[in-house]
Structures are given as structure tokens and as C-alpha cells.
């Protein structure tokens, strides 16, 4: 009992390693050999991809040299061409497309690149179907001579003179259909023309009539003083709501006048707005002011449209 039989199993103690140092010496050479074979395979694949590159000789010299480093570098196929033989390439996004004169795509691209042609300013409004029409133009001219109104009234056609009622000769012509107020000082006012050209033509005809009566009349300082336009917005308007919202610019007294008087600041135009949708614009010196005033007032009128 005091002597214990030897055990058939060799049980290692706490201080005994699990394998012998001889086994470590066998594992390390095997790992190095496998790593070296793996590096040679990578080099062979790289050389096969390179094909007939000028760097094949350089790769072959690498195969004969033992590799001491774990990491290897194999040049890719895209870098196989020598640097001095490469040409600078323009990036694709910076290249201009080839445009032929006969191709449809080329014509479309040219039309998009070139801006639209400039056109002269034309009257426009918030609603393209509504353009104010000129109804009356008032112009003045200086004949630069003293006039005998009684002589003019006696010898001229279509002329009337009543000094008790009005201190000017009232003369009319048919083409353009206008009326002139001729004063003894030589000043004349022409009204009733529908366009700027007609107003100037009518004033020249009146001056020619005065010349034929023996007066040394000239044609100086012709100027358009007032233009009147009108239009129809084609819908009824709530004038009560408009005067409450825009009381600073408008006045509405239906017992005195059926229209709302709207005094626009810029351009300086006075508008007469009626419940039926009719609008009268007056006070303009040029017709563009009438078009601009209507462009400004139309969205306001549309917001007060009767339902």
C-alpha cells in the first residue's frame, strides 16, 4: 500500500507545457514555407496579367530574389505603360460634345445655349386678353402770335365763338375727328384724338387753317398733356370692400358718383372703377403709364370679384 503502482497515463503537471519545444521548431519552418509559396503564386498571377509589358524582366528578377518582407507589391496592368509614353487625357465631364449642323440633337442644344431674341416692349397686363384702349388725347401747342378771334370765327369753317360763354374759338375738323380751343394769346388745345400721331396731325391742320387766314402762326412746343384709356375686366366688382381695404387711395360716394375713384401713386394715374367691371384710366403723359397702372390694379380688382 505504501508503494504506488506507476500510472499507465502520463498526466502533465501544472508547470509542464502542453507540447514539447521540438514541435515548435517544426511548426515555424512550415509556416514560413507556406507564406513563401503564397507570395510566389501572387507574383505569377501579376506577371500573367501584365502580358508583354516592358516590366516583365523586372518582375522576373523579383522572382529570383528572396522576399524578406511579408507584404509584396505587384504593379497593376493600368500602370504598365512608362510615364514618358503617356499622353495627358481630358476628363470626360470637361469635354465638349460633338455637334453636327444636320443633327436634331445638335440643333436642340444650340437653341438651348443661345438666348431668346430680344423683342421691343409691347403692352401687357396681368390678363393677356385685356389691354386698355386709348379714348382721348389732350395736347397743347403754341402758335407764337396774337390772334383776332372774331376774324377767325367769321372766316373759318366749323368755328364758333361766344366770348360771354368761353373766351376761345371752338373749331372742329373731321379727319382726324378732333376739336380745338384757340385762344387770343396764340395758345391752342387739341382734344379728341385716339393716338399720339393723330393728335399731332390735327394740331398741324389747325395751325395751317390759322395761317391761311393771314396770321403768322408757327408750330411750337407741341406736348401731350393727358391721355385717357378704358377697358372692361368682364366681372362685377365689390366696390364697398375695395374702399374699405384701400381707403388711403380710394373714395367711393355712390350717392354722388357711381364709380370708385382710385388715385394711384406710381404711376400717377387716376382710375374710375365701376361695379360692372368697367375701368377708366386718366392722367397719363405716355401710354405705357396706362398699361402699367392697369397691370397694378387688375390683381386688386380680381381679389374683390363678386361671387
From Swiss-Prot:
CDD domains: TBP_eukaryotes. Sequence repeats lie at residues 134-210, 224-301. GO terms for cellular component: nucleus; transcription factor TFIID complex. GO terms for molecular function: DNA binding; RNA polymerase III general transcription initiation factor activity. InterPro entries: TBP, TBP_CS, TBP_dom_sf, TBP_eukaryotic. The keyword Nucleus applies. Belongs to the TFIID complex together with the TBP-associated factors (TAFs). Binds DNA as monomer. PANTHER family: TATA-BOX BINDING PROTEIN. This is TATA-box-binding protein.
Amino acid at each position: 500500500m505504501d508503494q504506488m503502482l506507476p500510472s499507465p497515463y502520463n498526466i502533465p503537471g501544472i508547470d509542464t507545457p502542453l507540447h514539447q519545444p521540438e514541435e515548435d521548431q517544426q511548426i515555424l519552418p512550415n509556416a514560413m514555407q507556406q507564406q513563401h509559396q503564397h507570395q510566389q503564386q501572387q507574383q505569377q498571377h501579376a506577371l500573367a496579367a501584365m502580358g508583354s509589358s516592358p516590366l516583365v524582366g523586372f518582375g522576373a528578377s523579383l522572382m529570383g530574389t528572396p522576399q524578406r518582407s511579408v507584404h509584396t507589391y505587384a504593379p497593376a496592368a493600368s500602370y504598365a505603360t512608362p510615364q514618358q509614353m503617356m499622353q495627358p487625357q481630358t476628363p470626360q465631364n470637361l469635354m465638349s460634345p460633338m455637334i453636327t449642323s444636320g443633327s436634331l440633337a445638335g440643333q436642340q442644344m444650340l437653341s438651348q445655349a443661345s438666348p431668346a431674341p430680344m423683342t421691343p416692349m409691347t403692352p401687357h397686363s396681368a390678363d393677356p386678353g385685356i389691354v386698355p384702349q386709348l379714348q382721348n388725347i389732350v395736347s397743347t401747342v403754341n402758335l407764337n402770335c396774337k390772334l383776332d378771334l372774331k376774324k377767325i370765327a367769321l372766316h373759318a369753317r366749323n368755328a364758333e365763338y361766344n366770348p360771354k360763354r368761353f373766351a376761345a374759338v371752338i373749331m372742329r375738323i373731321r379727319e382726324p375727328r378732333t376739336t380745338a380751343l384757340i385762344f387770343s394769346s396764340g395758345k391752342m388745345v387739341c382734344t379728341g384724338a385716339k393716338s399720339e400721331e393723330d393728335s399731332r396731325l390735327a394740331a398741324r391742320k389747325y395751325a395751317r387753317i390759322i395761317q391761311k387766314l393771314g396770321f403768322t402762326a408757327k408750330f411750337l412746343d407741341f406736348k401731350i398733356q393727358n391721355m385717357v384709356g378704358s377697358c372692361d375686366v368682364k366681372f362685377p366688382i365689390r366696390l364697398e370692400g375695395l374702399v374699405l381695404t384701400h381707403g388711403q387711395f380710394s373714395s367711393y360716394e355712390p350717392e354722388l358718383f357711381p364709380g370708385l375713384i382710385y388715385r394711384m401713386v406710381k404711376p400717377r394715374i387716376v382710375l374710375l372703377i365701376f361695379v360692372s367691371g368697367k375701368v377708366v384710366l386718366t392722367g397719363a403723359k405716355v401710354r405705357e403709364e396706362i398699361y402699367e397702372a392697369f397691370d397694378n390694379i387688375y390683381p386688386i380688382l380680381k381679389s374683390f370679384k363678386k361671387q
